[in-house]
Amino acid sequence: MKIRSSIKKRSSGCQIVRRKGVLYVINKKNPRFKQRQG
């Protein structure tokens, strides 16, 4: 998982999710696009 200051959707399968006030990008098709905003 990459930790970035600004997260973007890198492909059409990416979804931006907010959990406990933290933004995440999850991608079931291509898990290497996972990101977290820090």
From Swiss-Prot:
Q: Which InterPro entries match?
A: Ribosomal_bL36, Ribosomal_bL36_sp, Ribosomal_L36_bact
What the entry lists under SUPFAM superfamilies is as follows:
Ribosomal protein L36
Q: Give GO MF terms, alphabetically.
A: structural constituent of ribosome
What keywords would UniProt list here?
A: Ribonucleoprotein, Ribosomal protein
Q: Is rRNA processing a UniProt keyword of this protein? A: no
Q: Out of the domains of life, which is the source?
A: Bacteria
GO cellular component: a single term: ribosome
Which cysteines are cross-linked by disulfides? none
GO biological process entries: translation
Enumerate the HAMAP family for this protein: Ribosomal_bL36
The entry assigns this protein to a family as follows: Belongs to the bacterial ribosomal protein bL36 family.
Cite the PANTHER family for this sequence.
50S RIBOSOMAL PROTEIN L36 2 (PTHR47781), LARGE RIBOSOMAL SUBUNIT PROTEIN BL36B (PTHR47781:SF1)
Protein name per its UniProtKB record: Large ribosomal subunit protein bL36
In which organism is this protein found? Answer: Amoebophilus asiaticus (strain 5a2)
Output the lineage of the source organism.
Answer: Bacteria, Pseudomonadati, Bacteroidota, Cytophagia, Cytophagales
